[in-house]
Amino acid sequence: MSDEEHHFESKADAGASKTFPQQAGTIRKNGYIVIKGRPCKVVEVSTSKTGKHGHAKCHFVAIDIFNGKKLEDIVPSSHNCDVPHVNRTDYQLIDISEDGFVSLLTESGNTKDDLRLPTDENLLKQVKDGFQEGKDLVVSVMSAMGEEQINAVKDVGTKN
């Protein structure tokens, strides 16, 4: 054995699954679902009755939580669907780099420098304008299935 100590920053979830199974018939509006490999928020669910052949079916209409695209899927209500583990974390904005990355302060006092500015025009303007005006900004970062994106910004006052 060596005398060296190895310190690893926990960035990943130690091989934990990015999704969990849930029966299609139990997924409701405002819940989450994976459609075509994308994490989505359910905006509409309709269930058809059992027909002559087969199961009752659930028709899901959902919006991709990262790119806003509308996706649809039809699944037998007794079957399992993948549901993404969705996390939302607030970070304080420290800096915006020239190449479009943001520097964020985590709760543990470390910096997180691997996130790009948001692609949404309104949100991008809010973040950039607020930062240039010297406001103290807190951004909400949504993460699911290995992707992360800034999806909201809050002004918590001006810097002293």
UniProtKB/Swiss-Prot annotation:
Biased composition (Basic and acidic residues): 1-12
Any GO molecular function: translation elongation factor activity
Presence of the UniProt keyword Nucleus in the record: no
Superkingdom: Eukaryota
Region of interest called Disordered, as start-end residue ranges on this chain: 1-21
Nucleotidyltransferase listed as a keyword: no
GO-annotated biological processes: positive regulation of translational elongation; positive regulation of translational termination; translational elongation
SMART domains on file: eIF-5a
Keyword terms, alphabetized: Hypusine, Initiation factor, Protein biosynthesis
Pfam families linked to this entry: eIF-5a, IF5A-like_N
Residues bearing the modification Hypusine: 52
PTM (free text): Lys-52 undergoes hypusination, a unique post-translational modification that consists in the addition of a butylamino group from spermidine to lysine side chain, leading to the formation of the unusual amino acid hypusine. eIF-5As are the only known proteins to undergo this modification, which is essential for their function.
InterPro entries: IF5A-like (IPR001884), IF5A-like_N (IPR048670), NA-bd_OB-fold (IPR012340), Rib_uL2_dom2 (IPR014722), Trans_elong_IF5A_hypusine_site (IPR019769), Transl_elong_IF5A_C (IPR020189), Translation_prot_SH3-like_sf (IPR008991)
Protein task: Translation factor that promotes translation elongation and termination, particularly upon ribosome stalling at specific amino acid sequence contexts. Binds between the exit (E) and peptidyl (P) site of the ribosome and promotes rescue of stalled ribosome: specifically required for efficient translation of polyproline-containing peptides as well as other motifs that stall the ribosome. Acts as a ribosome quality control (RQC) cofactor by joining the RQC complex to facilitate peptidyl transfer during CAT tailing step.
NCBIfam families, per database record: eIF_5A
Similarity section: Belongs to the eIF-5A family.
Name used for this protein in its record: Eukaryotic translation initiation factor 5A-2
Organism: Solanum lycopersicum
Upper lineage: Eukaryota, Viridiplantae, Streptophyta, Embryophyta, Tracheophyta
